[in-house]
Each structure stands twice: as C-alpha cells, then as structure tokens.
Regions:
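C-terminal regulatory/oligomerization modules of transcriptional regulators
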Residues: 1, 121-146
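N-terminal leader segment of winged-helix/HTH proteins
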Residues: 1-29
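Short, locally clustered residues in the helix-turn-helix/winged-helix DNA-binding domain
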Residues: 12-15, 40-44, 105
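Charged, amphipathic alpha-helical coiled-coil/dimerization segments
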Residues: 19, 69-129
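Pre-recognition alpha-helix immediately N-terminal to the DNA-recognition helix
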Residues: 37-40, 99
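Short capping segments at the starts of secondary-structure elements
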Residues: 45-49
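Residues within helix-turn-helix
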Residues: 50-51, 62, 69, 89
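The alpha-helix within a helix-turn-helix
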Residues: 54
Length: 146
C-alpha cells in the first residue's frame, strides 16, 4: 500500500467512525443522518430552496424530493411558494421541526465536543488546518472537473 492509499484509508475510516457515531445518535430521535442534516440546513437558512438544499447535501434533486416528502409527512418541514416566483419553493421548519432540531442539535454539539476533545488543542488545530487545505483542494478539483 502506498502512502497516499494509506492516507486515503485513514480519512475514509475517520469518516466512517464519525458517521457511525452520528447515525447511532440520530437514530435515538428517529432521524437518519440525511434527515438530521436537512433539518439542520433548513434551520440555519429558513426559506432555503430544495435545489440549494440538494447542493449543500451533495445529492440529486430526486433524493431531496423524497427526503422532504418524508420530513413533511412527519410534520417537521413545510414548503411555501416563493413570494415573487411561483416556480420556486421555500423550505421552513415547523414548530415541531424546530423543537426536534434544537433538541438533537444540542445533544449533537455535546457529542462533537466529547469526540473532538480526545485530541489535544495542538492536534486539533493542526488537523483543522490540514483539513481546511484538503477540502479547498477537493472543491477546486471538483469545480474544474464539472
């Protein structure tokens, strides 16, 4: 295995461990990771369009449509027609969705602190700097490749 393959495996394993922890946490609230992050993006950007949500979540519009239908059916999300352009929908959390997001978000923040608290401040800062650089490079490569 080359050094780059090993590095990729480390990054992937880190993602899988983080994702597994998140899935386990969110399942206690009846949420998948996707459902939580949809709620989280809408909570942070009330009036967000489904198209923008699909960009933020790196998934296609048909997946977002299914995800939103489920969140609407559960009473967490509502859609409103844009005031000036009836072709555009805007997404908002309902009171029930706001309560759920607030509760899960608070628990998730504590969970993040516990997990990242395993690193020293120096290691945490170094990892943040390295990941910022890596994410910028990936985003640039993505935009160059279409």
């Amino acid at each position: 295995m080359t050094g780059r393959e090993h590095l990729y495996d480390l990054i992937k394993e880190s993602f899988l461990l983080l994702d597994f922890g998140d899935r386990t946490l969110f399942e206690r609230y009846g949420l998948s990771v996707s459902r939580y992050y949809a709620l989280h993006h809408i909570a942070g950007n009330p009036g967000l369009s489904p198209s923008r949500l699909s960009q933020l979540m790196f998934c296609d519009k048909s997946n977002i449509t299914r995800l939103l239908q489920g969140l609407e059916a559960d009473g967490y999300v509502t859609r409103h027609v844009h005031e000036r352009d009836a072709r555009i929908q805007r997404l908002f959390l309902t009171d029930k969705g706001l309560r759920l997001h607030r509760e899960v978000w608070t628990v998730h923040l504590t969970f993040i602190e516990q997990r990242l608290g395993l690193l020293s401040s120096e290691d945490s800062q170094q990892l943040e700097t390295t990941l910022d650089c890596f994410i910028r490079a990936l985003a640039e490569a993505r935009s160059l490749n279409g």
